[in-house]
Amino acid sequence: MYPWLDRSGQLSWLKLSVFVGVTLPGLWAAVIWANGTPAAAGALGTSAMPVTAALHQIGLWAVRLLLITLAVTPLRRIGAWPRAITLRRMLGVSAFFYAAIHLALYVVQQNFRLGFVASEIVLRFYLSIGFVALVGLLVLAITSTDSAVRRLGGRKWQRLHYLVYPLTVLGLAHFFLQSKINVGEPILMSGFFIWLMLYRAAYHWNGDRGLSVVQLGLLAVGTAGLTLAGEALWYELATGIGGQRILAATFDFRHVRPAWWVMLVAAAFIPLKWAADRYWSRHRQAGGRAAAAA
């Protein structure tokens, strides 16, 4: 079945829109590669500059798509939008394909020296964990079909797909270690991941009641604080720049720190929650009036 069709085989404009959206970053990376200057790209367009730019863009989007996949659950619950669940499979499989293309571009960058690539994966820790994450995502992609759910059974399938959480951690660790000094983007992605995990923990703690607007606000602020602390700790331990300098720059908005972006995105779920509650409250009231009139 094509990814833009619903279960009845009909065109779904929502799924088609998401499919187009997940392909655009790949097309943009192809443009980056194709538009490398002859001097930089060489006769086949395979020298360091354009390939490396495409490699980094594709890897970044692999991580982003993993996080967007994990964001489907809070979007569905907070926004009271059950149809969002139909997008999760497409997003997750797209994350795998981006990760696989990321590896393929690394092979191209190394001039197709497969033996060298294999030795680098074994010897370099950040490449090793990235490869483990890719293999894990391959397993999840293969077992993402309806037939795989039937063969494994719902409970076993669900336990298997819980691996997405440690695999995302491995992907983020790979991102951190290859970024070295400039870890702004990995910090940002890690902050989003922290929020996604804390949201799940808080939701299960609350049970079927979900999270209130106040709880979502506290979660946004708390996640931003953890993101800032994590950034300061990274710079303190890994770079020698000093975490205090990061903390001191928190309110220097000439360069907005990742923690602020994390809080802004997390806080966006607050009006979504308010709007969803308001909509369903009106819907229930209208249903009650209709039942009373009948």
Task: List each model region and its residues.
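Membrane-embedded alpha-helical bundles that constitute the cytochrome b-like, heme-associated redox core
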Residues: 1-294
